[in-house]
Regions:
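Charged, glycine-rich intrinsically disordered N-terminal tails and low-complexity linkers that flank
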Residues: 1-131, 135, 264-269
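Nucleic-acid nuclease catalytic cores
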Residues: 118, 135-259, 263
Length: 269
């Protein structure tokens, strides 16, 4: 049996991504890897506590809220620049809050921004690639291949990491990763991006990667390139050792019904 951790989510495990909750990620990993076991324990939890658990992805939640309160989210989902994105995000949040004053505003903002920011980044990835090719006069190779490698094996499971790269500069043997910023360019590599780029370098056995951050304003796209070199010490101490520690705790959880129910109690409360 294999357990695969995505490169884009590995930093949640290592603690370098402070924006996403570890318990929520564990719940997601459990559901993805052991769906029948997850549903069985969710039913046990529901019966024990006499509650109905309604599980929704952020996308499903936003769609439900928009339909319930008759709020059009299409303009936001089709935003071509960051100013339009932010303006329409605020409009959606305000309209939903007006119609449902008791709604948790923090959770609403998180839901709207997570869905629409991710959508914006995905839709503008090709534009960023074209801009980069024009600026550098290169033709970056792209692929839809999912790369994965086994990291270690425990008594019960094979642990793997995997992911898809945005592009590869074949002339310079360098991985290219695009990040579409929403508010500003950072001009530095953030911690969770270091974990992600290191993972891609490990998967493809490359020593160099390049994070290209872009900010799309009306009529203009700003771009900054951050060079990232392979760091074996960082990989071993900050990623592999922390992943091994996580694997031990996750496997303990998977081996105990009592721990699973306690975890659901803590996470779903």
């Amino acid at each position: 049996m294999s357990i695969c951790i995505f490169a884009s989510e590995l930093a949640i495990i290592t603690g370098h991504n402070k924006y996403q909750n570890l318990n929520e990620y564990i719940l997601k990993l459990w559901k993805k890897t052991f769906p029948s076991d997850y549903q069985e324990h969710l039913d046990l939890y529901s019966n024990k506590n006499n509650v109905e658990i309604v599980q929704q992805t952020p996308e499903e939640k936003l769609l439900e809220l928009s339909k319930k309160h008759n709020v059009n989210i299409n303009e936001c989902l089709n935003a071509k620049d960051t100013k339009t994105l932010q303006t329409t995000q605020n409009s959606i949040i305000n309209k939903i809050q007006e119609k449902d004053p008791k709604i948790d505003l923090t959770e609403l903002k998180k839901c709207v921004q997570q869905v629409t920011n991710t959508n914006f980044g995905t839709k503008n990835e090709k534009n960023s690639l074209n801009q980069y090719n024009t600026k550098t006069q290169k033709n970056i190779a792209t692929t839809n291949k999912f790369f994965k490698k086994e990291i270690f094996t425990t008594k019960k499971y094979k642990w793997l990491i995997g992911g898809k790269i945005d592009g590869l500069d074949e002339d310079e043997d360098t991985i290219i990763e695009f990040k579409n910023r929403v508010n500003r360019l950072f001009y530095k590599l953030r911690d969770y991006e270091r974990v992600q780029t290191m993972t891609y370098m490990f998967l493809l056995e490359k020593n160099k990667s390049r994070l290209v951050e872009t900010l799309k304003n009306r009529g203009d796209t700003q771009m900054n390139v951050i060079e990232v070199a392979w760091d074996s010490d960082f990989w071993e101490t900050e990623i592999i050792e922390k992943l091994k520690s996580f694997s031990k705790e996750f496997e303990k959880l998977m081996n105990s019904t009592k721990k699973k129910l306690e975890f659901l109690e803590e996470t779903l409360e």
